[in-house]
Regions:
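Extracytoplasmic small-molecule ligand-binding "clamshell" domains
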Residues: 21-89, 97, 238, 247, ...
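Ligand-binding clefts/hinges and TM-proximal coupling segments of bilobed small-molecule sensing domains
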Residues: 62-64, 139-155, 197-198, 229-256
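A ligand-binding cleft/hinge motif common to bilobed small-molecule-binding domains
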Residues: 72-75, 89-97, 143-147, 174-209
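Ligand-binding cleft/hinge of the Venus flytrap
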Residues: 35-38, 52-61, 140-158, 165, ...
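Short helices/loops that flank or line small-molecule/ion binding pockets
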Residues: 54-58, 66-67, 71-83, 98-100, ...
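Extended ligand-binding regions for polar small-molecule ligands
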Residues: 49-59, 118, 126, 130-131, ...
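A conserved helix-loop-strand patch within extracytoplasmic ligand-binding domains
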Residues: 61, 90, 101-152
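Periplasmic-binding protein-like
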Residues: 29-30, 107-114, 191-229, 249-256
Length: 256
């Protein structure tokens, strides 16, 4: 895991109420384009990285982006190694038993992607006998195991979504399930465009898929939560959110 921290300078002068120490904002160390991934120089780039900078500036906080392995990101938060999570983490009842969340900052559908020309629907019947690849320790693992576990040949787990995508291209799995934006990015690549297509959105289950994506926070950190909520609200209200989103997405991903 990279130990180099990418510092996002919120150049506004900190007010007296601002936090004295930089806020360590955890992102997943595994690449998750277009939200966060390292460029050729090893710098973390992407929509979520840009949003962290904008939200922290709007809230007059100095923030440090800190890559953490996805499967250890909540323990890193609760143990104090990081102060917040902005890593496309869905707000679910299960997670809220352990941590708190800010207001949502995006909400997009969950979809199934499979090979072109293969009849497939995004439900248990359509995925019967199929090998479905999902990223481990995600809402997609929980959903696939709950809804497709009895009918699918296998729910195959991957450390990263990129690995699942590569196996789909190679024909080692029959389908993958993930956030629509992440899979749109895959389908925009040469390999993805050649092999695969969206088969449809899965039926929503907010208990598993959550109520949008928010900033993960330790319970009891009410002041920090208020700062993130204020920063999110400000970048949405002043148009910064849409300005940041425009290079990445054809339409708003804020959702309902």
């Amino acid at each position: 895991m990279k130990t180099t921290l990418l510092t996002i300078a919120a150049t506004l002068a900190l007010s007296g109420a601002a936090l004295a120490e930089p806020v360590k904002v955890g992102i997943a160390a595994e690449p998750y384009p277009p939200f966060a991934s390292p460029d050729a120089a090893g710098n973390w780039v992407g929509w979520e990285v840009d949003l962290i900078g904008a939200v922290c500036a709007a809230a007059e906080m100095e923030c440090v982006v800190t890559p953490v392995a996805w499967d250890g990101i909540i323990p890193s938060l609760t143990s104090g190694q990081i102060d917040a999570i902005m890593a496309s983490m869905s707000i679910t009842d299960e997670r809220m038993q352990t941590i708190d969340f800010s207001d949502k900052y995006y909400n997009t559908p969950t979809v199934i992607v499979g090979p072109k020309g293969v009849a497939m629907t995004p439900d248990a019947a359509g995925l019967a006998g199929k090998i479905i690849g999902v990223q481990v320790s995600t809402i997609h693992q929980d959903y696939a195991q709950t809804y497709f576990g009895d009918s699918a040949a296998e729910i195959k787990l991957y450390q990263t979504q990129d690995e699942a995508n590569q196996d789909l291209v190679a024909g080692r799995i029959d389908a993958t399930q993930a956030d629509s934006i992440a899979l749109d990015a895959f389908l925009a690549t040469e390999a993805g465009a050649a092999c695969c297509e969206v088969k449809g959105a899965v039926a929503d289950d907010p208990a598993i898929l959550g109520k949008g994506v928010g900033v993960g926070l330790r319970k009891g950190e009410d002041d920090l939560k208020a700062k993130f909520n204020a920063g999110i609200a400000k970048v949405i209200a002043d148009g910064t959110y849409e300005k940041i989103s425009a290079p990445y997405f054809a339409s708003s991903i804020y959702g309902g």
